[in-house]
Amino acid sequence: MALDKLDLYVIITLVVAIAAYFAKNQFLDQQQDTGFLNTDSGDGNSRDILQALKKNNKNTLLLFGSQTGTAEDYANKLSRELHSRFGLKTMVADFADYDFENFGDITEDILVFFIVATYGEGEPTDNADEFHTWLTEEADTLSTLKYTVFGLGNSTYEFFNAIGRKFDRLLGEKGGDRFAEYGEGDDGTGTLDEDFLAWKDNVFDSLKNDLNFEEKELKYEPNVKLTERDDLSGNDPDVSLGEPNVKYIKSEGVDLTKGPFDHTHPFLARIVKTKELFTSEDRHCVHVEFDISESNLKYTTGDHLAIWPSNSDENIKQFAKCFGLEDKLDTVIELKALDSTYSIPFPNPITYGAVIRHHLEISGPVSRQFFLSIAGFAPDEETKKSFTRIGGDKQEFASKVTRRKFNIADALLFASNNRPWSDVPFEFLIENVQHLTPRYYSISSSSLSEKQTINVTAVVEAEEEADGRPVTGVVTNLLKNIEIEQNKTGETPMVHYDLNGPRGKFSKFRLPVHVRRSNFKLPKNSTTPVILIGPGTGVAPLRGFVRERVQQVKNGVNVGKTVLFYGCRNSEQDFLYKQEWSEYASVLGENFEMFNAFSRQDPTKKVYVQDKILENSALVDELLSSGAIIYVCGDASRMARDVQAAIAKIVAKSRDIHEDKAAELVKSWKVQNRYQEDVW
């Protein structure tokens, strides 16, 4: 039957109306399409961030800049919650994995989260450096960008959250539309997790109130599928037992002595010497020398050594008990990503035990965020209610969990009266427990005098709580285990480690390491005077500096004055490298002076490095007038600030200016590299 014009008009009108209706619902119905339209996918450059979003049908991008893994962990957890609560199609991305030349072409239907840490003296993390350069120097208009930023920083540092604030400012200046308030966390006050949770709540409010998203009940949806492989065992050559990466599993024909070595691929360095530096019975500090002669790994004086950790036997046993895995540690599992943008964070197939020992951060303090996320898997309703209550109240969480220094297993077993949490999927743990990341140590040797070895100096973090639980640092206790075994001291360590490693690859005292470059460097002109300030293990890189100048003198090079201010508790118990300093003085002569502050030597008077600086203000002022560069290493929370205040006081007096003006002058020296810090 033929259609007349009126019928045709009505049909066309209905089609348009229906299309508009579904288009509107597609935009607003988060359960079906998460609130944003998606463009067609297409093939192209794998480093093209926009192509990746289109190809994988994503409408929410979370970019992280992370040095220690915390920002990455936050990004992953937020991604899962955005998907579960609001149906957003999320993609977590490492800045370093993509190019951003066409980032200005991003469309308004994409939400972008920047979760970025500040590293060092207001610098971006290594993986965010190229994006930072692009945003600062090359980016044009970003008028179609919808974004928000969370910065991770430490208020004890001079440039607190500089990168988060800079990103937020530049993105706005270039036309971006911030859909949720900027947020920042402060590790210096110990409130990083709480700050993130507060910001996350604000983001969710913005999504609901400003962007009209409907919030759903939070439900765990795994990104990975886990299969237990009964047909495989740890003896199969393709099964990971905790090797750093695939190259170390399938190492036949692969030269593992050639770099580049970085956070994705370490060198297995042999520890050739260890030494206990303290004489105290209850405190320990180890000197460790890594042999790099078998590789092309290089360093320069002042760099950092990254040591790849593993967990202690005791913490592994407790974690396995908590989740009912005691009899499954040798069982092989295979993981497959259910989302095309999710990357399995370690080689697999792999055993449960290898994941727990080498890849999960099980020894550190449990966060309130994790508490809330795991409550639904509690072994009984009473524990679930208790967990939800404690996790929902930051004061109660602080008093009942944080102050007791509970790790994950400690907290869960305490709350459940030692009933195992057997209903927690292992996939959940892989996705929600932060992954083990390298620990960084200031190198205490000189690349001029120790070309083939790298020295580190580490105080062993170990204490026993009132209930008898050991609270231990991961790497420092591993190093202490090696020192005890290598020197056959007969001591009993607080916790124990597998020193042989996967398939015996760590035997004969080897550990995976890589070098991270640092800007904490001696002046290129060797005659420039230097003022070195480093109490405790803060003296580590300064020892390297002094050794460098000693070697320069031996090589016939003229050097400037070196003045070292060192501090410790007691001259007889924890004076680091006590015998060495006189040897250095004999070589450097009048170009070396050392002043020691002992905070607990005299019970009636505590003396700190800043006191010694003020006592020798005339010398300090003379050196500053001669163009001396100041180097400070150690505790950022108090020491670094007190030292800076002491220097400002000396400057104010010598130049007859107000201390506030002197403080600003000293602060400006940091920008000029006349005042350098390596603090934590």
Swiss-Prot record:
It is found in: Endoplasmic reticulum membrane; Mitochondrion outer membrane; Cell membrane. It is a single-pass membrane protein. GO terms for biological process: ergosterol biosynthetic process. One of its GO terms (molecular function) is FMN binding. It comes from the Eukaryota. Its EC number is 1.6.2.4. Binds 1 FAD per monomer. Its main location: endoplasmic reticulum. FAD binds at residues 439-442, 457-459, 473-476, 680. It catalyses: 2 oxidized [cytochrome P450] + NADPH = 2 reduced [cytochrome P450] + NADP(+) + H(+). It holds the Pfam family FAD_binding_1. InterPro entries: CysJ-like_FAD-binding, FAD-bd_FR_type, Flavdoxin-like, Flavodoxin/NO_synth, Flavoprot_Pyr_Nucl_cyt_Rdtase, Flavoprotein-like_sf, FNR_nucleotide-bd, NADPH_Cyt_P450_Rdtase_alpha. FMN binds at residues 66-71, 117-120, 152-161, 187. Residues 24-680 are cytoplasmic. Residues 264-509 form the FAD-binding FR-type domain. Keywords: Cell membrane, Endoplasmic reticulum, FAD, Flavoprotein, FMN, Lipid biosynthesis, Lipid metabolism, Membrane, Mitochondrion, Mitochondrion outer membrane, NADP, Oxidoreductase, Steroid biosynthesis, Steroid metabolism, Sterol biosynthesis, Sterol metabolism, Transmembrane, Transmembrane helix. It is an enzyme of class 1 (oxidoreductase). Residues 1-5 are lumenal. Belongs to the NADPH--cytochrome P450 reductase family. This enzyme is required for electron transfer from NADP to cytochrome P450 in microsomes. It can also provide electron transfer to heme oxygenase and cytochrome B5. Involved in ergosterol biosynthesis. This is NADPH--cytochrome P450 reductase. It comes from Candida tropicalis. The lineage of its organism: Eukaryota, Fungi, Dikarya, Ascomycota, Saccharomycotina. The gene is NCP1.
